[in-house]
Amino acid sequence: MGGKWSKMAGWSTVRERMRRAEPARERMRRAEPRAEPAADGVGAVSRDLEKHGAITSSNTAATNADCAWLEAQEDEEVGFPVKPQVPLRPMTYKAAVDLSHFLKEKGGLEGLIHSQQRQDILDLWVYHTQGYFPDWQNYTPGPGVRYPLTFGWCFKLVPVEPEKIEEANEGENNSLLHPMSQHGMDDPEREVLQWRFDSRLAFHHMARELHPEYYKNC
Protein backbone atom coordinates (compact mmCIF):
# COMPACT_ATOMS: atom_id res chain seq x y z
CA MET A 1 0.00 0.00 0.00
CA GLY A 2 1.20 3.56 -0.71
CA GLY A 3 3.24 2.69 -3.80
CA LYS A 4 6.31 4.88 -4.17
CA TRP A 5 5.36 6.88 -1.06
CA SER A 6 6.16 3.83 1.04
CA LYS A 7 9.79 4.20 -0.03
CA MET A 8 10.08 7.89 0.99
CA ALA A 9 12.30 8.43 4.03
CA GLY A 10 12.00 11.09 6.71
CA TRP A 11 8.25 11.02 7.31
CA SER A 12 8.63 10.13 10.96
CA THR A 13 10.73 13.27 11.50
CA VAL A 14 8.25 15.48 9.64
CA ARG A 15 5.35 13.91 11.52
CA GLU A 16 6.99 14.74 14.84
CA ARG A 17 7.58 18.34 13.75
CA MET A 18 3.94 18.66 12.74
CA ARG A 19 2.81 17.24 16.06
CA ARG A 20 4.89 19.76 18.00
CA ALA A 21 4.01 22.75 15.83
CA GLU A 22 1.93 25.40 17.64
CA PRO A 23 -1.03 27.11 16.02
CA ALA A 24 0.03 30.39 14.42
CA ARG A 25 -2.05 32.45 16.85
CA GLU A 26 -0.49 30.77 19.86
CA ARG A 27 2.99 31.16 18.39
CA MET A 28 2.40 34.88 17.82
CA ARG A 29 1.03 35.28 21.32
CA ARG A 30 4.13 33.69 22.82
CA ALA A 31 6.44 35.78 20.64
CA GLU A 32 4.85 39.12 21.51
CA PRO A 33 6.43 40.82 24.53
CA ARG A 34 3.95 41.52 27.28
CA ALA A 35 3.14 45.21 27.48
CA GLU A 36 4.19 46.94 30.67
CA PRO A 37 1.32 48.19 32.83
CA ALA A 38 0.76 51.92 33.13
CA ALA A 39 2.40 53.52 36.14
CA ASP A 40 0.30 54.29 39.20
CA GLY A 41 -0.91 57.87 39.06
CA VAL A 42 -1.32 58.39 35.31
CA GLY A 43 -4.52 59.91 33.95
CA ALA A 44 -7.67 58.46 32.41
CA VAL A 45 -6.39 58.46 28.83
CA SER A 46 -3.32 56.44 29.78
CA ARG A 47 -5.61 53.96 31.54
CA ASP A 48 -7.56 53.71 28.30
CA LEU A 49 -4.37 52.99 26.39
CA GLU A 50 -3.37 50.36 28.93
CA LYS A 51 -6.70 48.51 28.80
CA HIS A 52 -7.72 48.96 25.16
CA GLY A 53 -4.57 49.93 23.29
CA ALA A 54 -6.29 53.07 22.06
CA ILE A 55 -8.15 56.15 23.27
CA THR A 56 -11.83 55.28 23.49
CA SER A 57 -14.89 57.47 23.09
CA SER A 58 -15.04 57.94 26.86
CA ASN A 59 -12.06 60.29 26.59
CA THR A 60 -12.46 63.08 24.04
CA ALA A 61 -11.59 66.76 23.86
CA ALA A 62 -15.09 67.48 25.15
CA THR A 63 -14.81 65.24 28.20
CA ASN A 64 -11.11 65.10 29.06
CA ALA A 65 -8.98 68.16 29.81
CA ASP A 66 -5.74 66.48 28.71
CA CYS A 67 -7.23 65.56 25.33
CA ALA A 68 -8.53 69.10 24.89
CA TRP A 69 -5.14 70.59 25.81
CA LEU A 70 -3.28 68.31 23.41
CA GLU A 71 -5.67 69.10 20.58
CA ALA A 72 -5.11 72.81 21.15
CA GLN A 73 -1.33 72.38 20.91
CA GLU A 74 -1.57 71.29 17.28
CA ASP A 75 -2.09 74.93 16.33
CA GLU A 76 0.71 76.25 18.54
CA GLU A 77 4.35 76.83 17.58
CA VAL A 78 6.34 74.74 20.06
CA GLY A 79 9.50 74.12 18.02
CA PHE A 80 8.78 70.55 16.99
CA PRO A 81 5.86 68.52 15.59
CA VAL A 82 3.21 67.76 18.19
CA LYS A 83 2.05 64.42 16.82
CA PRO A 84 4.19 61.52 18.07
CA GLN A 85 6.71 59.74 15.85
CA VAL A 86 6.08 56.43 17.63
CA PRO A 87 2.95 54.50 18.73
CA LEU A 88 0.89 56.15 21.46
CA ARG A 89 1.22 54.48 24.86
CA PRO A 90 0.82 55.11 28.59
CA MET A 91 3.71 56.14 30.81
CA THR A 92 5.06 53.13 32.72
CA TYR A 93 6.99 52.92 35.96
CA LYS A 94 10.21 51.87 34.20
CA ALA A 95 9.88 54.57 31.54
CA ALA A 96 9.32 57.24 34.21
CA VAL A 97 12.42 56.13 36.13
CA ASP A 98 14.52 55.97 32.95
CA LEU A 99 13.34 59.41 31.82
CA SER A 100 14.10 60.87 35.25
CA HIS A 101 17.68 59.59 35.22
CA PHE A 102 18.18 60.65 31.60
CA LEU A 103 17.15 64.23 32.41
CA LYS A 104 19.24 64.21 35.60
CA GLU A 105 22.34 63.08 33.69
CA LYS A 106 21.83 65.41 30.72
CA GLY A 107 21.02 68.40 32.92
CA GLY A 108 18.59 71.22 32.28
CA LEU A 109 15.68 70.22 34.51
CA GLU A 110 17.34 69.97 37.92
CA GLY A 111 16.88 73.32 39.67
CA LEU A 112 14.93 74.85 36.78
CA ILE A 113 12.18 77.21 37.90
CA HIS A 114 8.82 75.60 37.14
CA SER A 115 6.19 77.22 34.98
CA GLN A 116 3.20 75.68 33.25
CA GLN A 117 4.67 76.62 29.87
CA ARG A 118 7.92 74.81 30.65
CA GLN A 119 6.02 71.75 31.87
CA ASP A 120 3.94 71.80 28.68
CA ILE A 121 7.08 71.87 26.53
CA LEU A 122 8.54 68.89 28.40
CA ASP A 123 5.27 66.96 28.13
CA LEU A 124 5.02 67.62 24.39
CA TRP A 125 8.64 66.64 23.77
CA VAL A 126 8.17 63.32 25.59
CA TYR A 127 4.88 62.77 23.75
CA HIS A 128 6.42 63.53 20.36
CA THR A 129 9.61 61.51 20.75
CA GLN A 130 8.42 58.60 22.90
CA GLY A 131 4.65 58.48 22.42
CA TYR A 132 3.76 58.75 26.12
CA PHE A 133 0.40 60.49 26.45
CA PRO A 134 0.84 63.73 28.44
CA ASP A 135 -1.28 62.98 31.48
CA TRP A 136 1.55 61.65 33.64
CA GLN A 137 3.26 64.80 34.97
CA ASN A 138 0.94 65.86 37.76
CA TYR A 139 1.78 66.73 41.34
CA THR A 140 0.23 66.80 44.79
CA PRO A 141 -1.28 70.13 45.87
CA GLY A 142 0.58 72.71 47.96
CA PRO A 143 1.68 74.50 49.89
CA GLY A 144 5.15 73.04 50.29
CA VAL A 145 6.82 70.27 48.33
CA ARG A 146 4.70 68.87 45.49
CA TYR A 147 5.27 65.17 44.91
CA PRO A 148 4.67 63.48 41.53
CA LEU A 149 1.46 61.48 41.28
CA THR A 150 3.04 59.09 38.77
CA PHE A 151 5.14 56.45 40.49
CA GLY A 152 8.60 56.34 38.96
CA TRP A 153 8.88 60.02 38.03
CA CYS A 154 11.69 61.22 40.29
CA PHE A 155 11.34 64.98 39.99
CA LYS A 156 9.36 66.84 42.64
CA LEU A 157 8.54 70.55 42.82
CA VAL A 158 10.18 72.38 45.71
CA PRO A 159 9.44 75.97 46.81
CA VAL A 160 12.32 78.41 46.34
CA GLU A 161 13.42 80.23 49.47
CA PRO A 162 12.09 83.83 49.57
CA GLU A 163 15.62 85.19 50.05
CA LYS A 164 16.76 83.58 46.79
CA ILE A 165 13.75 84.97 44.94
CA GLU A 166 14.48 88.46 46.23
CA GLU A 167 18.15 88.13 45.33
CA ALA A 168 17.33 86.92 41.80
CA ASN A 169 15.01 89.87 41.21
CA GLU A 170 17.51 92.52 42.29
CA GLY A 171 19.29 94.70 39.76
CA GLU A 172 18.48 95.76 36.23
CA ASN A 173 19.27 92.50 34.45
CA ASN A 174 16.30 90.53 35.68
CA SER A 175 13.42 89.87 33.31
CA LEU A 176 9.85 90.46 34.42
CA LEU A 177 8.82 87.58 32.16
CA HIS A 178 11.15 85.08 33.82
CA PRO A 179 9.28 82.51 35.98
CA MET A 180 11.32 83.61 39.01
CA SER A 181 9.89 87.11 38.58
CA GLN A 182 6.31 85.94 38.20
CA HIS A 183 5.97 85.31 41.95
CA GLY A 184 4.18 82.00 41.52
CA MET A 185 1.50 83.20 39.11
CA ASP A 186 1.03 79.62 37.80
CA ASP A 187 0.68 78.22 41.30
CA PRO A 188 -2.55 78.32 43.37
CA GLU A 189 -0.43 78.86 46.49
CA ARG A 190 1.58 81.63 44.79
CA GLU A 191 4.83 79.80 45.48
CA VAL A 192 7.81 79.86 43.12
CA LEU A 193 8.69 76.22 42.49
CA GLN A 194 11.66 74.43 40.98
CA TRP A 195 12.17 70.88 39.76
CA ARG A 196 14.34 68.79 42.08
CA PHE A 197 15.53 65.24 41.44
CA ASP A 198 14.94 62.76 44.28
CA SER A 199 16.08 59.18 43.62
CA ARG A 200 14.03 57.93 46.59
CA LEU A 201 10.85 58.58 44.62
CA ALA A 202 11.66 55.52 42.50
CA PHE A 203 11.07 53.37 45.58
CA HIS A 204 8.83 55.47 47.81
CA HIS A 205 5.51 56.62 46.36
CA MET A 206 5.07 59.72 48.52
CA ALA A 207 2.01 61.00 46.65
CA ARG A 208 0.07 57.79 47.26
CA GLU A 209 1.04 57.83 50.91
CA LEU A 210 -0.05 61.45 51.38
CA HIS A 211 -3.14 61.34 49.15
CA PRO A 212 -4.52 57.78 48.93
CA GLU A 213 -7.83 59.23 47.73
CA TYR A 214 -6.24 59.91 44.33
CA TYR A 215 -5.62 56.20 43.77
CA LYS A 216 -8.98 54.63 44.55
CA ASN A 217 -9.48 53.51 40.94
CA CYS A 218 -5.91 52.32 40.33
Curated annotation (Swiss-Prot):
It is found in: Host cell membrane; Virion; Secreted; Host Golgi apparatus membrane. GO terms for biological process: symbiont-mediated suppression of host antigen processing and presentation of peptide antigen via MHC class I; symbiont-mediated suppression of host antigen processing and presentation of peptide antigen via MHC class II; symbiont-mediated suppression of host autophagy. A motif (Diacidic) lies at residues 186-187. The modification Phosphoserine is found at residue 6. One of its GO terms (cellular component) is virion component. It is a lipid-anchor. A motif (Dileucine internalization motif) lies at residues 176-177. InterPro entries: HIV-1_Nef_anchor_sf, HIV-1_Nef_core_sf, HIV_Nef. The record marks 69-70 as: Cleavage. Residues 1-44 are annotated as: Disordered. Residues 74-77 are annotated as: Acidic. It comes from the Viruses. Induction: Expressed early in the viral replication cycle. A motif (PxxP) lies at residues 84-87. It holds the Pfam family F-protein. Residues 160-192 are annotated as: Binding to ATP6V1H. Residues 81-90 are annotated as: SH3-binding. The virion-associated Nef proteins are cleaved by the viral protease to release the soluble C-terminal core protein. Nef is probably cleaved concomitantly with viral structural proteins on maturation of virus particles. Residues 14-37 have a biased composition (Basic and acidic residues). The N-terminal domain is composed of the N-myristoyl glycine and of a cluster of positively charged amino acids. It is required for inner plasma membrane targeting of Nef and virion incorporation, and thereby for infectivity. This domain is also involved in binding to TP53. The SH3-binding domain constituted of PxxP motifs mediates binding to several Src family proteins thereby regulating their tyrosine kinase activity. The same motifs also mediates the association with MAPK3, PI3-kinase and TCR-zeta. HIV-1 lineages are divided in three main groups, M (for Major), O (for Outlier), and N (for New, or Non-M, Non-O). The vast majority of strains found worldwide belong to the group M. Group O seems to be endemic to and largely confined to Cameroon and neighboring countries in West Central Africa, where these viruses represent a small minority of HIV-1 strains. The group N is represented by a limited number of isolates from Cameroonian persons. The group M is further subdivided in 9 clades or subtypes (A to D, F to H, J and K). Monomer; cytosolic form. Homodimer; membrane bound form. Interacts with Nef associated p21-activated kinase (PAK2); this interaction activates PAK2. Associates with the Nef-MHC-I-AP1 complex; this complex is required for MHC-I internalization. Interacts (via C-terminus) with host PI3-kinase. Interacts with host PACS1; this interaction seems to be weak. Interacts with host PACS2. Interacts with host LCK and MAPK3; these interactions inhibit the kinase activity of the latter. Interacts with host ATP6V1H; this interaction may play a role in CD4 endocytosis. Belongs to the lentivirus primate group Nef protein family. Factor of infectivity and pathogenicity, required for optimal virus replication. Alters numerous pathways of T-lymphocyte function and down-regulates immunity surface molecules in order to evade host defense and increase viral infectivity. Alters the functionality of other immunity cells, like dendritic cells, monocytes/macrophages and NK cells. This is Protein Nef. It comes from Human immunodeficiency virus type 1 group M subtype B (isolate BRVA). The gene is nef.
